[in-house]
């Protein structure tokens, strides 16, 4: 089998296609979570804490060149090392929300799977069948 046909067989398996669909949907869902965090949650947290924009919370680790604006983007473009803890906080909140949503989805899936009834055991054979089997086994042991 050639390498190309092996790859085609591998790529067309159901699991690989399911994984690809999952990755694409996950990427789109990640954008939704980013928007929820950046546009809805972080402004509320920023309002409570007193800073409206977490993305501009940083500490410079070196002296910036004279005349450089004190914004995160300008300092990064100027090559000034910065400790951007506000951006990190936003990413951590993103992760926690995404992990919680995935937890809820897995929990719901497990509940649905647990609710499926297990296949019932077959009922025991009637007593007359049991007696007939015992008689049959007894006759087998008596024959020479």
UniProtKB/Swiss-Prot annotation:
Subunit structure: Homopentamer.
Highest taxon listed in the record's lineage: Bacteria
Purpose: Channel that opens in response to stretch forces in the membrane lipid bilayer. May participate in the regulation of osmotic pressure changes within the cell.
Ranges that cross the membrane: 16-36, 86-106
Similarity section: Belongs to the MscL family.
Membrane association type: Multi-pass membrane protein
Gene responsible for this protein: mscL
Keyword Ribosomal protein: no
Protein's name in the database: Large-conductance mechanosensitive channel
GO cellular component, one term: plasma membrane
Keywords assigned by UniProt, alphabetized: Cell inner membrane, Cell membrane, Ion channel, Ion transport, Membrane, Transmembrane, Transmembrane helix, Transport
Alphabetized Pfam families for the sequence: MscL
Cellular compartment(s): Cell inner membrane
SUPFAM superfamilies: Gated mechanosensitive channel
GO molecular function: mechanosensitive monoatomic ion channel activity
Family matches, as InterPro entries: Mechanosensitive_channel_CS (IPR019823), MS_channel (IPR001185), MSC/AndL (IPR037673), MscL_channel (IPR036019)
